Amino acid sequence: MNFLITEISKFLLFWVLSYVLGNWVFHRNVKVNYTRKIHHFSLLFIPLFFATYFPYDRSGVISLIGSLAFVWTLFPFIFREKNTVIQRCFLGIDRPEDRPHTLLWLFTQFLASIMVIIPIAIVSEVFFDIAWENIGLFVICLAMIGDGFAEPVGIRFGKRRYKTFALFTRKRYLRTVEGSLAALVSTLLVVIVFNGLFTS
């Protein structure tokens, strides 16, 4: 499967999922905190699925373009005010506490992730002889799985609450000890799964 077909397939799959999740929020009153995390995991596992089962030859430039695929995947959300279908899709990620900056936070979150992952991957391959694809996947899993489990667990089981600041803002957000522990435990599990990357 070539690059273009793969990216179009991922794009369509993401948007079908977005529409389903948006309808869950609209018709079934499912909490956005849950649907947003399903989105969160889809941005990790959909590309991973295609990379595993439908690989294609990745040159340096193609790999870089592919790593920025989330930009054009999320881009249609910019036009949500003009299209009711896109509005419905947006419901699945639009947390009340993020409004009116929901899309800005999404773009900056993923751009910042790429800015961290790429240098780490390059340094790991050049100085430690670890394939950049492996270390890149490791870092992505650390960030997305840890954070992905924190919010649903905190919302469903959280009893012990505390407030903390988000990065680069003075706004305080409510978090739970249970959610934070879920992030810690799932992050440690990712480290265990990827233990083969580390030296003794």
Residue spans of the language-model regions?
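Interhelical loop and helix-boundary elements at the membrane-water interface
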Residues: 2-8, 21-62, 74-200
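Selected alpha-helical membrane-embedding segments in polytopic membrane proteins
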Residues: 68-74
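Alpha-helical transmembrane segments
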Residues: 10-17
